[in-house]
């Protein structure tokens, strides 16, 4: 039997040595210390120092450190941080006093000189880029190596919009109200302020411009930003649609075929309808239209033409004429003043002085292209001054106007008027076209006020005009901004708070009051930012509300105004007077359409065989009695029976029948005209008074005694002429004079003052209108009939 003990595979565990070693190794201590510190354990100073270390290295703290940081008492933590600041300041002073070796400086200079170094007034100037923000900028000076620090927040890309100011020398004091400082000598610094896309800084504020409302001109031309144009276009669309139902249906069909949705179809139809009213008869499609009617034998007619209105003249045995003032042109107007509405600034420079060192100065202050401002700022140890107090500061920036507007003076001798005369022929193409193709244009200038135009088949018409616009150009300025123009009040234009320069043509413009478009920001110890306001074009458009808008084309300006003309019709002949009356029947081509002047348009086609002939046309009541209507188209005739004829007439108020033709074959059309004769009388009277107010000085001519009576007569006729015609339309010339004499006699013999004055006034007006007719009129004496025949 083998009694020997077997060897164990592993040594047995010593129970006496099972406890941990009481003295830790170095690695164990470091591991335990760092682990506790990361969890926030340890003395407060140690933990706060570790937090500062982590922040310098941009390492995020752990949750334990954040928890311990939140548990610190405020006063104790502040005392510890103040101690840190004191120690760091001592370290900085030690480093500043240490003399660097030449080898170390030579090693640092290539990396520090990433900027451009130049001089300004014998002092060093740094031109830095965006990458130098927060870096130490080192360069050699006579006083040694100068180290500058720049922490400007507006440091951007280099461009013409630069900022230049002086960095103060600071050694021991902490910087205060400065973003740049040096340790050896004062140094100028220049940098750009543009963004990466090259855009300049702008202030979005707009200048407070007084509106032009209430200072506009009293003309029929619509004003800027008014709703008149929109309403006129809507009325044109309505009239055109009712007059041309076939084209309206075609437009509806096209919109339905092109559009894919109800909204799209509606938009397309509206756009089509807004375009179509451009095809309209010359005077029929114009809302402001005046009728001037002369009697048999009239040889001349006085008319006053306005922009936006049309005059239709009628006289027996004379053709009906549509006359319109197309445009009033002025060439090469003199520039009164230029205003700047958009500018940019560059080369912003600031200089400052410490207290008791006098006023700050800049060379740019003497340059008229720079805008400058002086102020005072707080200075002291923290920004390079030995004394505390107010120091002088001046900032200048170069001003350049980018967009400007011009105010021009219009001179009478530079005016040129274009008048178009169209004969009412009844041609179907004339009705469907508003162009100048069917009219004849006459040109009137102050040098050539008389013009004779030839009207095909109707003879010659002589226009003898007085080239006076009725506008007082001493009070009116033609304002031009980009491609738009307005007529504005001169004093309003001169009072606009915008930078201005004279209208004289010079190689270099000198702007006054540039500060109106420039904003100087809050001034700091060594620097002041300057920004320019944005474009004022929108503010100007708003301020021009109520001004008369003008259309411009090239160098010629078209604007509102008046033109007084005498139409000499002695050479005019009426075509077709010798034709016989048509005996055949007529067919209505289109439904009778009403115009906006109370007249109707009738388009008929002749079915007879005796053309050419005159078309019988009349207005009758239910019993067949001819009523007092008016035929606008003089002597309507049929030349070619294959072509329709358009006839314009004015039926009486109420129910009536429009009769085209004669006998049993006549075409009889029922018509109802709204309104009343009395209402029309008051409306025409008010319109005449308004016309006299609009014409102003053009309605008066006090050059002689005869001129005085002519002007007074014109006033009476313009205001009371229509009312007189309605009240005494069926009274003979002798009876009119008798009524006027009777009323005047009653007034002279009345004991009541008010009744006497009323009777005398009414009697004199009645007597005057019965004997003489003025203004838009034509007169001739008929000795055989003992009557003075004039147009009304």
UniProtKB/Swiss-Prot annotation:
Residues 1-101, 261, 747-752 are cytoplasmic. Residues 1-15 are annotated as: Interaction with host EXOC1. SUPFAM superfamilies: E set domains, Flavivirus capsid protein C, Viral glycoprotein, central and dimerisation domains. The keyword Secreted applies. Residues 120-242, 281-725, 776-792 are extracellular. Residues 101-114 form a propeptide. GO terms for cellular component: extracellular region; host cell endoplasmic reticulum membrane; host cell nucleus; host cell perinuclear region of cytoplasm; membrane; viral envelope; viral nucleocapsid; virion membrane. Keywords: Capsid protein, Clathrin-mediated endocytosis of virus by host, Cleavage on pair of basic residues, Disulfide bond, Fusion of virus membrane with host endosomal membrane, Fusion of virus membrane with host membrane, Glycoprotein, Host cytoplasm, Host endoplasmic reticulum, Host membrane, Host nucleus, Host-virus interaction, Inhibition of host innate immune response by virus, Membrane, Secreted, Suppressor of RNA silencing, Transmembrane, Transmembrane helix, Viral attachment to host cell, Viral envelope protein, Viral immunoevasion, Viral nucleoprotein, Viral penetration into host cytoplasm, Virion, Virus endocytosis by host, Virus entry into host cell, Zinc. It comes from the Viruses. The transmembrane domains of the small envelope protein M and envelope protein E contain an endoplasmic reticulum retention signal. The keyword Glycoprotein applies. Gene3D superfamilies: 1.10.10.930, 1.20.1280.260, 2.60.40.350, Flavivirus envelope glycoprotein M-like (1.10.8.970), Flavivirus polyprotein propeptide domain (2.60.260.50), Tick-borne Encephalitis virus Glycoprotein, domain 1 (2.60.98.10), Viral Envelope Glycoprotein, domain 2 (3.30.67.10), Viral Envelope Glycoprotein, domain 3 (3.30.387.10). Residues 37-72 are annotated as: Hydrophobic. GO terms for molecular function: protein dimerization activity; structural molecule activity. The chain crosses the membrane at residues 102-119, 243-260, 262-280, 726-746, 753-775. Residues 378-391 are annotated as: Fusion peptide. The record marks 100-101, 114-115, 205-206, 280-281, 775-776 as: Cleavage. This is Genome polyprotein. One of its GO terms (biological process) is fusion of virus membrane with host endosome membrane. Disulfide bonds join 283-310, 340-401, 354-385, 372-396, 465-565, 582-613, 779-790. Glycans are attached at residues 183, 347, 433. InterPro entries: Env_glycoprot_M_flavivir, Env_glycoprot_M_sf_flavivir, Flav_gly_cen_dom_subdom1, Flavi_capsidC, Flavi_capsidC_sf, Flavi_E_Ig-like, Flavi_E_Stem/Anchor_dom, Flavi_E_Stem/Anchor_dom_sf.
């Amino acid at each position: 039997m083998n009694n020997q003990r077997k060897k164990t595979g592993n040594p047995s565990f010593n129970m006496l040595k099972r406890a941990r070693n009481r003295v830790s190794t170095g690695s164990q201590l470091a591991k335990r210390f760092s682990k506790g510190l990361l969890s926030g354990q340890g003395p407060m100073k140690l933990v706060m120092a570790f937090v500062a270390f982590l922040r310098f290295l941009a390492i995020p703290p752990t949750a334990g450190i954040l928890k311990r940081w939140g548990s610190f008492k405020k006063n104790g933590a502040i005392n510890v941080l103040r101690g840190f600041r004191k120690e760091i300041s001592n370290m900085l002073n030690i480093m500043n006093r240490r003399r660097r070796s030449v080898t170390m400086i030579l090693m640092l200079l290539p990396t520090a000189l990433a900027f451009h170094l130049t001089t300004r007034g014998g002092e060093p100037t740094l031109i830095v880029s965006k990458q130098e923000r927060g870096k130490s900028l080192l360069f050699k000076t006579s006083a040694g190596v100068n180290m500058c620090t720049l922490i400007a927040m507006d440091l951007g890309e280099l461009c013409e919009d630069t900022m230049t100011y002086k960095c103060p020398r600071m050694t021991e004091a902490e910087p205060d109200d400065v973003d740049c400082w040096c340790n050896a000598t004062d140094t100028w610094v220049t940098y750009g302020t543009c963004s990466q896309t090259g855009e300049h800084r702008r202030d979005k504020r707009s200048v407070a411009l007084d509106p032009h409302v209430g200072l506009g001109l009293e003309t029929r031309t619509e004003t800027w930003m008014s709703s008149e144009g929109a309403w006129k276009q809507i009325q044109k669309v309505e009239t055109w649609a009712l007059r041309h139902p076939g084209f309206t249906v075609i437009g509806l069909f096209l919109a339905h075929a092109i559009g894919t949705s109800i909204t799209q179809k509606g938009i397309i139809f509206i756009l089509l309808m807004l375009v179509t009213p451009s095809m309209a008869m010359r005077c029929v499609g114009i809302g402001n239209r005046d009728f001037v009617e002369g009697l048999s034998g009239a040889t001349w007619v006085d008319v006053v033409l306005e922009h936006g209105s049309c005059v239709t003249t009628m006289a027996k045995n004379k053709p009906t004429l549509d006359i319109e003032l197309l445009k009033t042109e002025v060439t090469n107007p003199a520039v009164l003043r230029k205003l700047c509405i958009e500018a940019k600034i560059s080369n912003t420079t600031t200089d400052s002085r410490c207290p008791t060192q006098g006023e700050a100065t800049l060379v740019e202050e003497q340059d008229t292209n720079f805008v400058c401002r002086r102020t005072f700022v707080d200075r002291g140890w923290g920004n390079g001054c030995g004394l505390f107090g107010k120091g002088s500061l001046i900032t200048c920036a170069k001003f350049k106007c980018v967009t400007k507007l011009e105010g021009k003076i219009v001179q009478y001798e530079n005016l040129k008027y274009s008048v178009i005369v169209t004969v009412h022929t009844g041609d179907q193409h004339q009705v469907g076209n508003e162009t100048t193709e069917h009219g004849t244009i006459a040109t009137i200038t102050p040098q050539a006020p008389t013009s004779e135009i030839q009207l095909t088949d109707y003879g010659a018409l002589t226009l003898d005009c007085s080239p006076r616009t009725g506008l007082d150009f001493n009070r009116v300025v033609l304002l031009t901004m980009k491609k738009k123009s307005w007529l504005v009040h001169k004093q309003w234009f001169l009072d606009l708070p915008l930078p201005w320069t004279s209208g004289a043509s010079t190689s270099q413009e000198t702007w006054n009051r540039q500060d109106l478009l420039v904003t100087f920001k809050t001034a700091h110890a060594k620097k002041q930012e300057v920004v320019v306001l944005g474009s004022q074009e929108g503010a100007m458009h708003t301020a021009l509300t109520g001004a008369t808008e003008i259309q411009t084309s090239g160098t010629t300006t078209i604007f509102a105004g008046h033109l007084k003309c005498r139409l000499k019709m002695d050479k005019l002949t009426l075509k077709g007077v010798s034709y016989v009356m048509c005996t055949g029947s007529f067919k209505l081509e289109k439904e009778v359409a009403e115009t906006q002047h109370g007249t109707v348009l009738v388009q008929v086609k002749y079915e007879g065989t005796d053309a050419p002939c005159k078309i019988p046309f009349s207005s009758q009541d239910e019993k067949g009695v001819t009523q007092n209507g008016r035929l606008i188209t003089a002597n309507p005739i049929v030349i070619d029976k294959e072509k329709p004829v358009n006839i314009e007439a004015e039926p009486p108020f109420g129910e009536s029948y429009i009769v085209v033709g004669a006998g049993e074959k006549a075409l009889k059309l029922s018509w109802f005209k709204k309104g009343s004769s009395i209402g029309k009388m008051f409306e025409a009277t008010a319109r005449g008074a308004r016309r006299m107010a609009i014409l102003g000085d053009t309605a008066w001519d006090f050059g002689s005694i005869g001129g005085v009576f002519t002007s007074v007569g014109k006033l009476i006729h313009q205001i009371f002429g229509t009312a007189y015609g309605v009240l005494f339309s069926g009274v003979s010339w002798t009876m009119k004079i008798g009524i006027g004499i009777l009323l005047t006699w009653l007034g002279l013999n009345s004991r009541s003052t008010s009744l006497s004055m009323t009777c005398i006034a009414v009697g004199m007006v009645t007597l005057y209108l019965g004997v003489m007719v003025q203004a838009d009129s034509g007169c001739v004496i008929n000795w055989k009939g003992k009557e003075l025949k004039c147009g009304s």
